């Protein structure tokens, strides 16, 4: 049992407590700035990925989250692209540099960036994109 997830009486979920405490400590303006920063960083990642035709934006950046997919030159079957994207996520996550996970959207395996840390910089985002590009070059399914 995670007592943090329960209210003072330890029987019901206290879902609002985390948000309430965050707003009390940081204030609504600071929370707004953090959310805006995440949105800007995700939009930067989207802009950078759109400049390379090997990447497909599956769902535009929203609230700091970007869903995209490596499509290479467009000739690989979806099953191979699904494996390739899974390998890319594993490669970059295993490196410890960034946490890039996969999900399924529109029946396809896609990569997901969730850029919500308030200290994430433009350089961090660009370096993550660079490492994604390196990972796709060495991913097993690409050989």
Predicted regions and their residues:
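Conserved PLP cofactor-binding pocket of PLP-dependent enzymes
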Residues: 65, 94-112
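Active-site C-terminal subdomain of aminotransferase-like
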Residues: 1-53
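C-terminal, well-structured subdomains that either form a transmembrane helix-short loop-helix hairpin
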Residues: 49, 62-67, 112-114, 125
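A generic structural motif
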Residues: 25-28, 72-74, 117-121
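Short, hydrophobic beta-strand segments
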Residues: 21-22, 67-72, 111-116
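Conserved PLP-binding catalytic core of the aspartate aminotransferase-like
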Residues: 57-92
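PLP-dependent enzyme catalytic core of the Aspartate aminotransferase-like
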Residues: 105-143
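Flexible, glycine/charged-enriched surface loops at secondary-structure junctions
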Residues: 49-60, 102-103, 142-143
